[in-house]
């Protein structure tokens, strides 16, 4: 589920956690998520924190146990583009802050570029796709850069659209700081 306002929710029909190959996980009350989620340290040195979820496994068995699943921060839902590519354009929005920060993941051949547009959809000078070098990798806190740098001060507080052009990539979240 996800919500843009905390009041209205969208639920997807696809499984979030699949039962896996063990037959015992396909029956009543298995894969039931335990109450709450935790922010935990990654097992990889230097990697960002992650979200841990726990679910029941083998509920009716003598050796009933909890299984830990991990997600990247804000990794519940993403805008996805396959290798053929895709685009997403936001509705006009106003923001406070000086920089755009994205949480994303690409393949080695994938990328994301960001264009800042006026409210009618025209690229703002200095913030076009041509001004944004390809972004690739796997980060939860990457500041978007354009040729002139990362500052968005000149468009802050004004209605703008953000255009994301993506290839073999997932965009999990955006924020301004």
Model-derived segments and their meaning:
Residues 1-177:
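Carbohydrate-active catalytic/glycan-binding domains of CAZyme proteins
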């Amino acid at each position: 589920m996800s919500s843009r306002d905390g009041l209205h929710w969208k639920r997807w029909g696809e499984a979030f956690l699949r039962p896996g190959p063990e037959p015992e996980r396909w029956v009543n009350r298995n894969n039931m998520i335990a109450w709450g989620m935790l922010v935990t340290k990654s097992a990889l040195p230097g990697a960002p924190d992650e979200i841990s979820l726990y679910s029941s496994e083998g509920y009716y068995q003598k050796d009933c146990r909890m299984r830990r699943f991990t997600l990247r921060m804000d990794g519940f839902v993403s805008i996805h583009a396959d290798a053929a590519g895709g685009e997403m354009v936001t509705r006009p929005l106003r923001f406070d802050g000086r920089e755009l920060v994205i949480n994303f993941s690409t393949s080695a051949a994938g990328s994301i570029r960001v264009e800042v547009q006026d409210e009618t959809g025209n690229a703002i000078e200095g913030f076009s796709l041509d001004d944004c070098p390809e972004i690739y990798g796997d980060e939860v806190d990457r500041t978007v850069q354009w040729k002139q740098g990362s500052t968005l001060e000149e468009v802050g507080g004004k209605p703008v659209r953000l255009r994301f052009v993506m290839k073999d990539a997932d965009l999990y979240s955006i924020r301004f700081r």
